[in-house]
Amino acid sequence: MRGTLATALLLVISSRVATESNQLDPQQLSNHVVGTYDKIYTKSSPRRFLRGSRKQRDDLAPTAADENRTINNAIESAMHGITFSGGTTAATRNAAREVVDINAFSKRPRLSLNVPPSETSAHLIEAPTFPQRNSASTSTTSDIATSSSRTSNQRTPKTQASLDMSHKTMTRKSSSKNQFKKSTALKSTKRKVRARKIPAFVVNKVYTLYFDHVKTKSLGFDPTVKETKAMLSLYFESSVDPFYVSAVLSNFFRYFDDKELTIHKKKLGTTLTSALSTLAALELPPGMLKEIERPFVWYASLKRWRVMYCDFFEFVKVNSDKITNSLPNKEFYRGETSDIVRDKLLATLKKETNTNTRYKRKRKLKNDLDDVLKKYNVKEEIGAAIRDLGEQFLKADRQTIPSRRPTRRPGASHIQPSNQRTDLTPHGLQVPGPEKNSYQHIKSKDHARKKRPRSSS
């Protein structure tokens, strides 16, 4: 009789819990359940489904009202079938309480994997594939022992830890794989040929030889070690497309501090010195005066840089053997450069003198001056004086390296002498001898065929 009563109580409570589990609202599901167009499926085991949300576990547990109602129903059913004394009623009440207490803990829900889609299924939001584990269940040792028969097929903590570790490994591999693909895509856009890193002993030796060359010929400009390194780097980079001279100078000039700027101003001739003296007479703030001087020094340095640019490559070509023999590692230099490389470098310099490139330099100088004037908010008359000084520098911008024109017949008297080029640079430096013919081999063959010979008379 008692076995029949216990079986009836278990069937009643199990049926009620199973019914409530199958009637869950999709909006109240935890983040382990994902709603699709035609089904609802769980991403993990039912035990992990209940463990992921404490609120969900509390919703599935019977409330106090359900517990009292179940106990009363069980007692009424037992009273109809039991004819013993009142002591049996107390035993039945205790047995019912024990059954309710057992079912109050986490229980595996019976979710249907093929539930038809409802109106609220579209509002479900997919959660992360592997959410983090929450705190463990609050069941006691006796409760776990009581329900061990129902949880024998669940994952142990050791198994779950190994699964989590394997997931982290897979995630790390997938992320590293994506990073590898991204870096490969970036590498494909970079230049395939890279310039060699020049050791310090090579730079110092080339600088010593080139400085003696400049001093012997009295060219008027004395290069620094940094400038020699920049030109030497550009020389070794000749296997790829060379940079513009102005771009190399801008990148090199960016790292000038105030001390280097003061030393550099002494190498740029009297034109810049008089302009800077005019700026100093305006009584500008010290910070503004330094910022105003920098664009002018850059512009004047570009003219000096062009002359030194061509002369350096001529020096390297002529003194290639001397440079190679003076280095401890003779294999580094690899001998002299071919005429093709030299032509490419000089052709790049020729682009610096075209109309479009000169217009960009003029615009850059004006923009730099305007930025400084706006920053310090100077008076209109001071700003006008600084802009006029900038216009004087722009008018002096002309082709530094003169190209030799075809010789004309004596009868061509309509050409004005003022249009002829001189061999002097804008800052008063004599152009080196080899540079006067720098563009002779770059001229097109069509232009050479149009050259008329002199008359025999």
Curated annotation (Swiss-Prot):
Instruction: Write out the biased-composition intervals (Polar residues).
Output: 153-163, 176-187
Which keywords appear in this protein's UniProt record, sorted alphabetically?
Answer: Glycoprotein, Host nucleus, Secreted, Signal, Virulence
Short sequence motif named RxLR-dEER, residue ranges: 48-69
Role noted for this protein? Secreted effector that completely suppresses the host cell death induced by cell death-inducing proteins.
The listed locations are: Secreted; Host nucleus
Gene transcribed to yield this protein: RXLR8
Biological source species: Plasmopara viticola (Downy mildew of grapevine)
**Notes concerning its domains:** The RxLR-dEER motif acts to carry the protein into the host cell cytoplasm through binding to cell surface phosphatidylinositol-3-phosphate.
Q: How is this protein named in the record?
A: Secreted RxLR effector protein 8
